[in-house]
Regions:
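Active-site environment of divalent metal-dependent phosphoester hydrolases
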Residues: 12-14, 40-43, 66-72, 109, ...
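Residue-level marker for buried hydrophobic side chains located in beta-strands
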Residues: 5, 34, 61-62, 115, ...
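Active-site-proximal beta-strand elements of phosphoester/diester hydrolases
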Residues: 2-10, 114-120, 235-236
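Acidic, His/Gly-rich catalytic cores of divalent-metal-dependent hydrolytic chemistry
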Residues: 131-270
């Protein structure tokens, strides 16, 4: 039995199936970790959601920014963007079931060996603290009044964490750190505009602020950073939807598996 962490799929269903064949995935023995952004930009978001949801407990999925965007679109709180490609999900006969399955996913996951999050973790948070904060968001997403949370989720303010934050501001900072952040200051002030691997003045990649802290982290979200196999923090977003590759890391021995992707979008997005 093995566990494979897989980078941002973003609707690239054919490439996902090729990757699983590449390492001989067994539904009876193996587990899959997905770093988020199952949907959008690629052509087959519906197939991806149906396949991954059907894996049951064999698949652990953390929510990414595109997954949350799908939820807000479905509930009518976000206008369609020109490059959105999940109409197949919105128009599907099983859309409600898939959306409910998606919003029941965590935004952070950890076991005794590894931690997984889509974007990053702020330097002030220990793994245990971050898991507790993630649980606050997960409870809001799963509550009967979850639509109110989705309605108030978006925004880039506040830019930094404080234990005194409450209400929508508190939940928004947690969501932004775990699904949108790339750079922050040592004090935890986040920056959301830059997407390249080069930090803006005064900022550093979030993972550089966590050197020597706790168990290793696997994450995605950062195609312009690309594949980064560091024992402390590994980025598995190798830009499949942009013409790069789809990557999987076997967590037991850190063996890497990749398949080439044809690319559905011009490089440079998120």
């Amino acid at each position: 039995m093995a566990t494979y962490a897989i980078g941002d799929v973003q609707g690239c269903y054919d490439e996902l199936r090729k990757l699983l064949a590449e390492f001989g995935f067994s539904r009876k023995k193996d587990n899959l970790w997905f770093v988020g952004d199952l949907v959008n930009r690629g052509p087959k978001s519906l197939e991806v959601l149906r396949f991954v949801s059907d894996l049951g407990e064999r698949a652990v999925v953390v929510l990414g920014n595109h997954d949350l965007h799908l939820l807000t679109q479905y509930e009518g709180f976000e206008r369609k963007r020109q490059d959105d490609t999940f109409d197949d999900v919105l128009e599907a006969s099983d859309a409600r079931a898939l959306v409910d399955w998606l919003r029941a996913r965590p935004i952070m996951h950890a076991d005794e060996r590894y931690t997984m999050v889509h974007a990053g973790l702020l330097p002030q948070w220990s793994i245990e603290e971050a898991l507790a904060l993630a649980k606050e968001v997960e409870l809001a997403l799963r509550a009967a009044g979850y639509r109110k949370f989705l309605e108030n989720m978006y925004g880039s303010k506040p830019e930094e964490w404080s234990v005194s934050l409450a209400g929508w501001d508190r939940l928004r900072v947690i969501v932004n750190a775990m699904t949108r952040m790339r750079f922050c200051t040592p004090e935890g002030r986040m920056e959301f505009r830059a997407k390249s691997a080069q930090p803006p003045a005064g900022y550093r990649p979030w993972y550089e602020m966590r050197r020597g802290r706790e168990r290793p982290i696997v994450f995605g979200h950062w195609s312009q950073l690309g594949l980064r196999l560091d024992p402390r923090a590994s980025c598995l977003d190798s830009g499949c939807v942009w013409g790069g590759s789809l990557s999987a890391l076997r967590l037991e021995d850190r063996a890497l598996y990749q398949v080439a992707c044809g690319g559905y979008k011009a490089p440079g997005g998120d």
